[in-house]
Amino acid sequence: MKLILILIFLFSCILFINCENLIKVLDVRLAQTHVIPVEGKTWNLNNNIQHMSIVGNRRAFLLASFDDPTQTYYTTIWFNDKLVGPLKLNDPSQLPPTEDKGEKYSTVHHSIMLSKEWVKVGMKIQFFTIGNDGNGSSVVKSSDFFYPDVGQDYTLKMWTLPFYLFGANDTNTQPFSKTKGIDSEITKELIEKWSCSDLQAINHPIQKIDWSYFVMEPRNGNPAMVITNSDQKKDGYAIMSGVLNILTQIRKVFGESSSSIQIYSPLLHLDSKGKYADPYGGLGGGSRGTGDYTYKGIFIHEQGHAMGLPHAGEAFDKGTFPYQKGSLSGSEWGFDANHNEFLGNFLPPTAEYYRNCQKSFLIDNKGRCIKQSVMQGGAGDQSSKYRFSMFADYEMTTIQNYFKNSIYYDETNGTYKKWNDTSKSYYDYKPITQNKGLWGIDDGTPIERDIDVYTILFTHSTVGPKELSQIYPLLKSKGNLMRQFDPTNKTEMAIIIPNTGAIPWYCHDSGCDYTVRVTFDDNSLQHVLLQQGKRKYWKPMSDLKDNIMDPKSSDSFMLGGINVKANKKINKVELLETLLGWNGISNNATVLASKSF
């Protein structure tokens, strides 16, 4: 059929020269997460311009309306001026339904699904009909070309890393087999909600965190403390905040801080009675999220925060979200390719909150309750067949920007790349040390990948008690190794001497006053100078932090982490005080924390 169409099309063009712009096309749209104009959609909120593109290498549902809807229409997809696909459009009566048999999206649009291989930068679309000239000869009438705004193609990689705390295990909470990852059906639905080409949700190489205690940082006027059950926390988000801080360290030591790789940690912990304690919420931001183990509304909300999304209602109040009260009033309809149906911006009858929605929801001009964004209490607004509700179309711009600004590692050739949104292409990128090392080196990328490593996490309080200075249990996995500096090596220390070394601002954030010393089973030692200290910002050689002796201040507390090669067994890990560490360390350096293994 495709070959016949191509031959008819080309034959008609050659013989009759009738491929003129005779078809009047009224509207062309493409649907992925949302149904948007073929040229994309742009917002200007208080002179802040945001644009939503079509995601490359992802299937897209094509809709087109014509001046004469009664004709049979075809579309051709072109790439680099080569024809890659003619397709017959389905007539408006065959347009997919709306969730829960809701109002039809359109009665005038012809449509067809485009495979992901055809959705790429540089594609163009043309429509045509095949008629008869009255003399028994075929005549092709064609349209102008349409140029979809296709943007970046990218795969969202997400680690899942369950936290089992205070004696939580497979028997008294949930089995690791259930919490360690997201099954394929959930992944399929998430792809339909997030603006990405593909999604890989994988259990982190560490597999899980299993600790009997947790060191809480100073928070909300409370001092740091060691807790052994969830009832000891001082506020509802305290443990979750601590989990996010741990995840920050893990992303950093694995060399993922500048990547788009996300991490989510289901939190399973026990209360003072040894019973499972539901976290009743979640917390997210900075590519990290934590919450319950069900991978439902809390999960998708927190991973929205992880990609930079704020609460939609608060953003509306600030003028940075376009739709009233964080709703979807004005947002384009959604589309779910898995179910081949449209998702209205109004609550469907089987939604959890449908029954009493008129008491608190915005109402449209047809008397229907308008959905809330996932980022504003929208969980429960979806049809019962779905696990997750919808984001607003505008929120896809934040998600797309999240990926545009990341560094990508190409596993096929061991190189890095970044996206250029002007040329709409990836380009080779070599990581560099920016800002003279102030926030780290090598763009936060590792120097070795996929090797056996120990992840060492630790805490220290400058005011005590001593139990606040801890070396957590070792975590062994397959991971990455960052470039490190050894304070016993004068050549390496010369590189980071403040103001004069090759990386002169390495210690300017808070000083370089701590070293981790690792003793292996062959009695060999490894020293790693930390980019952490006691100093005021930009005072690496002098003033201590103002509140370094205040137990309720974050100035008095440190959480850190490193990865070291696991080619030898570790016997002991120590955290040393090594003031002005670029000067080297003494044989009698103060041991702040120590643990033997």
Swiss-Prot record:
One of its GO terms (cellular component) is extracellular region. Zn(2+) binds at residues 301, 305, 311. Residues 1-19 form the signal peptide. InterPro entries: Dictomallein, Peptidase_M66_dom. The active site is at 302. Transmembrane segments: none annotated. Binds 1 zinc ion per subunit. Its EC number is 3.4.24.-. It is found in: Secreted. PROSITE patterns: PEPTIDASE_M66. Keywords: Hydrolase, Metal-binding, Metalloprotease, Protease, Secreted, Signal, Zinc. The keyword Hydrolase applies. Its cofactor is Zn(2+). One of its GO terms (biological process) is proteolysis. Pfam families: Peptidase_M66. Residues 148-409 form the Peptidase M66 domain. One of its GO terms (molecular function) is metal ion binding. PANTHER family: DICTOMALLEIN-1-RELATED (PTHR39540:SF1), PTHR39540. Belongs to the dictomallein family. This is Dictomallein-3.
